[in-house]
Regions:
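A conserved helix-loop-beta module that forms one wall/lid of the active-site cleft
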Residues: 87, 91-156, 171, 175-190
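Beta-strand scaffold of nucleotide-dependent catalytic cores
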Residues: 158, 168-171, 200-204, 210-231, ...
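A short glycine-rich, hydrophobically flanked beta-strand micro-motif that places a catalytic Asp/Glu
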Residues: 270-283, 328, 429-437, 448
Length: 499
């Protein structure tokens, strides 16, 4: 008997991975969000972006798409708004999925911090809301880390060193109501709380080694799949690559697993995947939560497959159909896997990229490789969605015996791809191929190499982005004492952390 899986806000990885894993008799319905891309609303393209589809209306449109078909499961690997829409649609269809309220609370960086303080207070930095509309000063001592309550690719997240610096940064967020509107609308519908669309979160600055702890919850039990190291380009917040398994000491990883398990069990998160970004300060031994994502980390799906033998999309499909997943360990073809980001810190014109046939030929040389291209010929790197600090133009994920073997393969693959980038201030086209492993980024056992294009200087761009017209606003006191939620007995602590 055929079974149908509904994929909400389908991504390019969904289209790539799911057909490879699908059992016979499984069909997919791929849903696309009926709106201007939300990402555009927090970039320089915001002024040209159209209106955002009402998320509550989108739920009804998705149900109309389904029609009378029987749905065996609902999934989404999309961060925003996909995971929240999927939880809401699954609830309506009566199939397993995380609770919509818990999903939304995790997605809202401020409300998530409130719940973290309830369950794992020792892993939470000082935090407070900032009212953008009134231009209030930071209630925390500088330096602070300023974040929107929701974002993509860390856009808008930056270290602020003074009141003067804060005053410069705040105006751009005053007119971005449309971006925050879907989350605020759904929070009111499913959690009975609204923080409004003109608030940012200030946090104490975290230092150390960044990792992602990923796991799943099924039948009320939380299981951890793995810990993935995040390696940054030196002196930046830009990811260079993601390494699995983590090189952190086993004892540190065990503490992180305990924090993640306590947090997700305390929330009552169930029937889904999650990933929690954490920071480990080697000097103090402190473990801190950066943020909780109530979804799978799709970029890591094939890393687990390479090392453990189980693609995390398989776990997602099993849970969505009400089946207990089986995540085996260290049964893959490789001892190590990495996902390397092709990134520049200056803008380039894209002259040429490899064809699909070129990538297929590369896969015959390096089995199990995954190549993603985010650059298009005839366009500048800055024309694509970027973080405002650098220019990502591709991802190469592969396995190896160890880190050195994987990086050697990566360098060879990058050269084989033959991506041609032209400097904007010159006419000759020069292939950007050779990667220099001179620079060092902090690693678990001292240092590990970070991949930096030869001759590319770190020169971040900071474009001021004009926002879209406001569409919805509601007021809520900028405090986190007494915040109450509609279900699950969730209540914020009766004190203000970091004030």
């Amino acid at each position: 008997m055929s079974r149908t899986i509904l994929v909400i806000c389908a991504t390019h990885r969904d289209h790539r991975e799911l057909p490879l894993l699908a059992e016979s008799g499984i069909d997919f319905i791929f849903h696309d969000y009926a709106s201007t891309s939300l990402e555009d609303l927090i970039t320089e393209r915001a002024a040209e972006a159209g209106l955002v589809a009402d998320p509550l209306g989108e739920i009804e449109r998705i149900l109309e798409l389904v029609g009378g078909r029987e749905i065996a499961g609902v999934i989404s690997s999309d961060d925003y708004p996909g995971s929240a829409l999927a939880a809401a649609v699954a609830e309506r269809l009566g199939v397993p999925a995380p609770d919509p309220e818990i999903t939304l609370i995790c997605q809202h960086k401020y409300l998530s911090r409130v719940m973290q303080e309830n369950h794992v207070p020792d892993a939470v930095p000082p935090f407070a809301l900032i009212d953008v509309a009134n231009g209030v000063s930071s209630p925390l001592p500088f330096p602070i880390f300023l974040k929107p309550v929701k974002s993509f690719f860390s856009i808008g997240a930056e270290k602020i060193s003074s009141e003067a610096d804060l005053a410069i940064r705040l105006p751009r967020w005053k007119e971005l109501d449309q971006f925050f509107l879907p989350l605020d609308r759904m929070l009111w519908r499913y959690a009975g709380v609204s923080i409004g669309t003109k608030r940012l979160i200030a946090e104490g600055v975290l230092n150390g080694r960044q990792v992602t702890v990923e796991g799943y919850a099924y039948g009320g039990t939380v299981s951890i799949m793995g810990v993935v190291d995040s390696i940054m380009f030196p002196a930046t917040l830009a990811f260079a690559r993601f390494d699995y398994p983590s090189a952190l000491p086993k004892g540190v990883q065990a503490r992180m697993v305990e924090v993640a398990t306590t947090m997700m069990e305390g929330l009552g998160f169930d029937n889904g995947l999650f990933n929690i970004e954490m920071m480990y300060d080697r000097e103090t031994g402190q473990i801190s939560i950066i943020e909780i994502n109530p979804r799978m980390a799709s970029q890591f799906a094939d890393l687990y497959e390479k090392v453990d033998g189980t693609n995390s999309y398989r776990v997602l499909l099993d849970i969505a159909q009400g089946r207990e997943p089986s995540f085996i360990r260290r049964q893959g073809r490789y001892g190590f896997a990495t996902s390397c980001v092709l990134r520049s810190f200056v803008d380039y014109r894209v002259e040429a990229v490899p064809s699909d046939e070129d990538i297929k030929r590369l896969a015959t040389l390096y089995p199990d490789i995954r190549v993603e291209l985010h650059a298009r010929p005839g366009r500048n790197l800055s024309d694509e969605l970027q973080d405002g600090q650098s220019y990502r133009y591709g991802i190469i994920s592969l396995g190896g015996r160890d880190l050195a073997d994987a990086l050697q393969k990566f360098t060879a693959c990058q050269n084989e791809l033959g991506i041609v980038l032209r400097p904007l201030d010159s006419s000759p086209s020069e292939p950007l191929r050779a990667f220099d492993l001179r620079t060092q980024a902090q690693g678990a056992s001292g240092t590990v190499e970070a991949l930096v294009p030869s001759g590319v200087a770190a020169r971040p761009s900071r474009a001021h982005r004009k926002g879209a017209e406001p569409g919805f606003s509601s007021q809520c006191p900028p405090r986190h004492d007494g915040v109450r939620f509609r279900t699950n007995g969730l209540k914020a602590p009766d004190h203000r952390r970091g004030a």
